[in-house]
Amino acid sequence: MRLAEDLYGAGMQVVLIDKNNFHQFPPLIYQIASAGIDPSSISFPFRQIFRKRKDFYFRMAEARMVDTEKKILQTSIGKIDYDYLVLAAGATTNFFGNKNIEDWAMPMKTVPEAMGLRNALLSNLERALTCATEEERQELLNIVIVGGGATGVEIAGALSEMKRYVIPYDYPDMDSSLMHIYLIEAGDRLLAGMSQDSSKKAYDFLKGMGVDIQFGKMVTDYRDHKVIMKDGSEIPTRTFLWVSGIRANAMPGIDESHQGRGFRFKVDQYNRIQGLDGVFAIGDQCLQTTDEAYPNGHPQVAQVAIQQAKNLAKNLKLINGGKDESALTPFIYNNLGSMATIGRNKAVVEIGKLRSQGFFAWILWLVVHLRSILGVKNKMMVLLNWLWKYVSYNDSIRMITYATKPREVVERMEREQTTHLGEDLME
């Protein structure tokens, strides 16, 4: 989206292809899952964002295949010719080939996934009040989170606050002490991308909030409502969250030889996929090893994607204007820092030489993320939700809702699943 914004006035026709008609703000997706904010507060319709742009076109479709020789992109609505193709489809959850975990674990990469997790959490609480056995009740009240990165830490903290501030009031006939939150990490510390001090502080915060943190544990399976570890230990649960890793989304038609670690496309210093004409990749989909400070590739975080988009927009304008490679600007990542919030008045922040923990870090986290949200209305909605939650000790969005798709939509989706699978590229 940043790339499309920065190409404004470049004399180019910009076509955005996405299977959803909205942009989402990933850093706050966990707050949807924990019933803290409404999905619409961090979701922004593309057509609304670009409605004043005469050079911009949006098509809701899935990219199916690309013919890099003919410069044709095959989508679920047909084929599209291109001069320059930029892949910015991000990443998906990596289950490391474990089919049982993929089938049963709940990921949290997208707004729909977060809404599904929220429904599951609330439904399990309702069921725990009426189930027939103590064994089932404990399975419903145990929450297992796999992955000790920022997402795992933040959702663990949010759920711990739900247990403390919401459950006793919304479910007065439930013994909230039966609710256990487990955070499983294969490594030896939380927030591995941050300093040891921040990792230790995050650990202390979560332990103080009652989260059971287990290091050096590798989850190998999920069977019979049990998370199974490599050492043979088990945790019974029906709420199994997997935030342990990601892999780049694939693009059929581009040979696997162009992929590197994490299935990311290998790109040069200008984000061109090596060996392909006019094809670029940015964000989580690319592996760029030309930056001296990041010889193994950049971290898969939003700031990298935003900065790459800005740099690529400048270079595309030059390329389209006939400039040669010497005029282009190589990408160098400017690390603006890392931060994670654990709960009320609890956060860790690292920005340059600044190291902050606790209340000030929490305020800084709030300000940074609030500024990053698109639109004044959305900023106000999120701010009001946060203020209400802070004053009342109460989350605001706790409805269980399941979307019902009209028959026409279901039939159209079924048709699209069996058409435009690449046959057009053979014509």
Predicted regions mapped to residue ranges:
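Rossmann-like dinucleotide-binding core of oxidoreductases
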Residues: R137-M194, K201, D212-Q214, P299-P330, ...
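Cofactor-binding loop segments of dinucleotide-utilizing enzymes, especially the Rossmann-like FAD-
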Residues: I17-K19, A89, G148, A186, ...
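C-terminal, flexible cofactor-proximal segment of oxidoreductases
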Residues: A313-E427
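Short glycine-rich anion-binding loops that position phosphate/pyrophosphate groups of nucleotides
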Residues: G90-T93, A156, I246-A248
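FAD-site-proximal beta/loop scaffold in flavoenzymes
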Residues: D103-T133, H225-I228, E234-Q307
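A Rossmann-like FAD-binding core segment of flavoenzymes
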Residues: K54-M65, S160-Q269, I273-G275
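Beta1-alpha1 glycine-rich phosphate/pyrophosphate-binding loop at the start
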Residues: M1-R59, R64, A150-G193, L241, ...
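FAD-binding core/adjacent interface of flavoenzyme oxidoreductases
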Residues: F56-V144, L241
